[in-house]
């Protein structure tokens, strides 16, 4: 599985070349999120696979990159072919790409 830096992910997101999948809990998503993301908490992923676009590359996002890594592995095992993990999660994005995002 690919690990992308915040800068790499931001460049792809700016080109609208990927779908960001945020797997954090609702309270975390309310604190801060990346515009245009698809929010499905990790615990809901198995029941909501049909809500995740298969024809588009995915970058999975969480707080620091651990939950998103697990979800990315889960998706790859279920036939999603182009899945990457955001290394360092939204915290890395806030530090490197958008310092206006709340950090927690």
Question: What are the roles of these predicted feature ranges?
Answer:
Residues 1-19, 26-57, 66-104:
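Rhodanese-like catalytic fold shared by cysteine-dependent sulfurtransferases
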Residues 61:
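Short, surface-exposed ligand- or partner-binding patches at beta-edge/loop junctions that are enriched
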């Amino acid at each position: 599985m690919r690990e992308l830096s915040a800068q790499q992910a931001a460049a792809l997101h700016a080109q609208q070349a990927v779908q960001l999948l945020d797997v954090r809990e609702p309270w975390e998503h309310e604190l801060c999120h990346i515009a245009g993301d698809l929010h499905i908490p990790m615990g809901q992923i198995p029941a909501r696979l049909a809500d995740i676009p298969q024809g588009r590359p995915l970058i999975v996002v969480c707080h620091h990159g651990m939950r998103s890594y697990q979800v990315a592995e889960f998706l790859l095992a279920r036939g999603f072919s182009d899945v990457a993990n955001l290394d360092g999660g939204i915290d890395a994005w806030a530090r490197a790409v958008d310092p206006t995002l709340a950090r927690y």
